[in-house]
Amino acid sequence: MNILGIETSCDETSAAVLKNGLVASNIISSQLCHSEFGGVVPELASREHDRMVVTVVEAALNAANIKKTELDFIAATAGPGLIGAVLVGLSFGQALGFSLGKPFIPINHIDAHIFSSFINDGTQHTFPAFPFVSLTVSGGHTMLCLVHDDLRIEPLGSTIDDAAGEAFDKTGKMLGLNYPAGPVIDKLAQTGDPNFHQFPQALTAQSKTGNDYKANLDFSFSGLKTSVLRYLSGQKPEFIQAHLNDICASIQEAITSVLVRKTILAAEQSGVRTISVTGGVSANSELRRKFEAASKAHGFSLHIPKPVYSTDNAAMIATLAHLKAERGLIEPCAYNAPAFAGYEKMKVFRAR
């Protein structure tokens, strides 16, 4: 079974080919034009996707040594994401499927991150056992869910305001760091003191039902951003520069600690022994270290994709399409892109 995956939800134009579940190619073109603006400009993103999508798809097919006519399925991100950006890949994928008479599978971008722990490029030997608790954490999303064998996703908690990745980027911008600031903070924090300043961790209280205590599995990072802003406004520029690494480490500590703590609580409350951590922020070295230590201490099986599969990529789109096709979870239908897709079922579009 040969599947072409296409990803254009934000600022990466990516295409990948899976051959019988194995990654044969995964081409990613990152848009560098947004760095001068300190964030992604939607109109620029759409135009860059439109300019690059044909080139990237052709590169993926060539790298996999496969012809378009040999494809069995074509899949593309259908939301959520920047609506103009999503429409580029979605429209291209549908048109390609129609022209070839191949089935098209629209893929929920968040779901693709959740199942990115199943990406197989030949080097992975173990994959999450169902059911498992998944933490998906990126610039636009922070959520916990319970994942079942039929690919059903049961939400457990999510951010009530800002995503963890956004907290990294916005606090980094306050510090004068380049966009995206997450990787920069990660690097600077490695030589900083995480206890230099204690920034707040929100929604950590537990509620009592009868004789049982239940953790709040939602997240909030808007208060952290405000706290960092107030802290920095009270310091002299010389002080901030002298302690930049320590401040970065303290910010990273506040974000990563609450992510790990709530994921462990979610697994314990759900009664599962397997945890998966995905999304762009899962590439953070301190988050990985904390999860490895916590999983070992609590006896959980931990699965985190390689960094190249943590950020937006088409291999995860094709992988989820493969899992759906294996289970027969595709049906003929037309599909359009919503700006926010939530968890509604996304079906297959088949050329008639």
UniProtKB/Swiss-Prot annotation:
Keyword Cell cycle tagged: no
Q: What is this organism's lineage?
A: Bacteria, Pseudomonadati, Chlorobiota, Chlorobiia, Chlorobiales
Q: Which Gene3D superfamilies match?
A: 3.30.420.40
> Protein name, please?
tRNA N6-adenosine threonylcarbamoyltransferase
InterPro entries from the UniProt entry: ATPase_NBD (IPR043129), Gcp-like_dom (IPR000905), KAE1/TsaD (IPR017861), TsaD (IPR022450)
* Primary subcellular site in the record, as a coarse category: cytoplasm
- HAMAP family named in the record: TsaD (MF_01445)
Task: List positions binding substrate.
Answer: T136, V137, S138, G139, G140, D169, G182, D186, N284
Give the reaction(s) catalysed.
L-threonylcarbamoyladenylate + adenosine(37) in tRNA = N(6)-L-threonylcarbamoyladenosine(37) in tRNA + AMP + H(+)
Which CDD domains is this protein grouped with?
Answer: ASKHA_NBD_TsaD_bac
Cofactor stoichiometry and binding?
Binds 1 Fe(2+) ion per subunit.
Q: Which cofactor does it need?
A: Fe(2+)
GO biological process assignments: tRNA threonylcarbamoyladenosine modification
Organism, per UniProt?
Answer: Chloroherpeton thalassium (strain ATCC 35110 / GB-78)
Supply the alphabetized keyword list. Acyltransferase, Cytoplasm, Iron, Metal-binding, Transferase, tRNA processing
What PANTHER family does this protein map onto?
A: TRNA N6-ADENOSINE THREONYLCARBAMOYLTRANSFERASE (PTHR11735), TRNA N6-ADENOSINE THREONYLCARBAMOYLTRANSFERASE, MITOCHONDRIAL (PTHR11735:SF6)
One GO MF annotation is:
N(6)-L-threonylcarbamoyladenine synthase activity
